[in-house]
């Protein structure tokens, strides 16, 4: 059995609560294609962010290798846009280029980017039935104003907050106000299935990034 340690850095604390179970499910699925049995362990890398995104990635790469022996560093950043082009051009690609200049015995230089279009909260609506269940309402997606593609929403987080308010407005005040968006990250990360996320090009991009790094490490065969 091969032990594979994978590091994770994200923009904020709630992102970790949502993404870690999503990432673990994604990695488990991809590991089925590996030639041998692989035990995967995802490690959150707590480190100084420095003055720039590149500093953050560099610090995490070094700490992740030295403390955990990571082979891959998953790097999350929101696109904050209708596509991920600027995030790759201004953040991911420069960070990857910088890592290639670092010694392999001090830094992990294998990066897999995770870039949700708009923001993390877009992915939280990948399974709308799971979302509706999480807020405890019988209202439908039209009543909650969460119809359509969440990656097309200008502000997905605001949509979720409004949906929580609309979905629970009929409840007694004590119940109505005891749920907010921060309560949903862990639950939805566990509840949302990979097949639902595959409706998003940004998730397919992440999945392909993982597969590419697995191929570079000779864990899965290169596809022609």
Predicted regions and their residues:
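C-terminal accessory helical subdomains adjacent to catalytic cores in phosphodiester-
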Residues: 1-3, 16-46, 57-224
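Non-catalytic terminal and connector segments of soluble metabolic enzymes
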Residues: 50-54
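Short polar catalytic/cofactor-binding loops
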Residues: 12-14
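Conserved beta-strand elements of the Class I
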Residues: 5-9
